[in-house]
Amino acid sequence: MSEPIDILIAGAGIGGLSCALALHQAGIGKVTLLESSSEIRPLGVGINIQPAAVEALAELGLGPALAATAIPTHELRYIDQSGATVWSEPRGVEAGNAYPQYSIHRGELQMILLAAVRERLGQQAVRTGLGVERIEERDGRVLIGARDGHGKPQALGADVLVGADGIHSAVRAHLHPDQRPLSHGGITMWRGVTEFDRFLDGKTMIVANDEHWSRLVAYPISARHAAEGKSLVNWVCMVPSAAVGQLDNEADWNRDGRLEDVLPFFADWDLGWFDIRDLLTRNQLILQYPMVDRDPLPHWGRGRITLLGDAAHLMYPMGANGASQAILDGIELAAALARNADVAAALREYEEARRPTANKIILANREREKEEWAAASRPKTEKSAALEAITGSYRNQVERPR
């Protein structure tokens, strides 16, 4: 990139903030993030960052902050509703990667990224309370109509617009006005974070199923709690939506859920060494939403506009890959703009580098979801072999040692 350019990123989530840091590190123009929320707060629950994305964040200078905050996940362990191990596999460094797989609170990761952006790019780099409403390309510029928290219209312009504005992306809607609705996986999820006793080695993710396809996923996400001999546990309870009696496609990541709705599905579980009832009842806030994704796009952007993260490739959480792919999007976008002085061509290079991988993961996550639910009702001996095959196939498709 020879001439300085102005870049607007719609959305100051994990993908948008990572992209801003990568663009700044590459010395590419002036970067401004527009965030529709009036205040960026550490919301959400736990997520996983895969080794490739951890490496990318380390190269942005965030390795020490991650290590001080997150849990390096060592093992993925599948168990039955009695707590007996069905299948397990190593993760992160234990699986031969040079970098760990980190489990971390989404809000804490966002705050790490936000602090780095404000320190390196300046406080003015993140403008809150501005939601994108109108987009137009004219004379080699992207013109954006936004509205602030008081309803006052704002006019902005840039050489590049990056839509990192999430599942209900305004930028994606502009680029793909005929987009299909969210695709429902037929699963309702309840999620929460609970201060809990340490379990197993304090670095293990557990996945438990019963024969009725109710599922629990739980893993620790806080280095601070671990240092105190305890765990901050992220948990997800998944139940077929038909059993819940609702099929809601309106995904809202901050919708409140109710203990009395989720607890009956796990009332007869006895994991022995892990008290699921205690985990759920000690939780302060329960979130509820459907498991959804979007069909892969044949192209992401056009001209001087592109997408990244959930705006480009919303995927099921089965492979714990969504946030990692958003981070890798941002890294590749910065690299493409650094290589190519033609902005539009650089954006297409970025898309060609990232879209096939992201689309493959969308489909692989759908397939893994079907296969794991199908394996739930099998006898234990068959289930072990099935899970070994499922996880091995997934690794071969979407993971690579880092």
Curated annotation (Swiss-Prot):
Keywords: FAD, Flavoprotein, Monooxygenase, NAD, Oxidoreductase. Involved in the biosynthesis of pyocyanine, a blue-pigmented phenazine derivative, which plays a role in virulence. Catalyzes the oxidative decarboxylation of 5-methylphenazine-1-carboxylate (5-methyl-PCA) to pyocyanine. Can also act on phenazine-1-carboxylate (PCA), converting it into 1-hydroxyphenazine (1-HP). However, PCA is a poor substrate. Monomer in solution. Probably interacts transiently with PhzM. The gene is phzS. The keyword Membrane does not apply. Residues 368-385 have a biased composition (Basic and acidic residues). Its cofactor is FAD. FAD binds at residues 14-15, 35-36, 43-45, 106, 132, 191, 310. It holds the Pfam family FAD_binding_3. It comes from Pseudomonas aeruginosa (strain ATCC 15692 / DSM 22644 / CIP 104116 / JCM 14847 / LMG 12228 / 1C / PRS 101 / PAO1). One of its GO terms (molecular function) is 5-methylphenazine-1-carboxylate 1-monooxygenase (NADH) activity. It catalyses: 5-methyl-phenazine-1-carboxylate + NADH + O2 + 2 H(+) = pyocyanin + CO2 + NAD(+) + H2O. SUPFAM superfamilies: FAD-linked reductases, C-terminal domain, FAD/NAD(P)-binding domain. Its EC number is 1.14.13.218. Residues 368-402 are annotated as: Disordered. Pathway: Secondary metabolite biosynthesis; pyocyanine biosynthesis. This is 5-methylphenazine-1-carboxylate 1-monooxygenase.
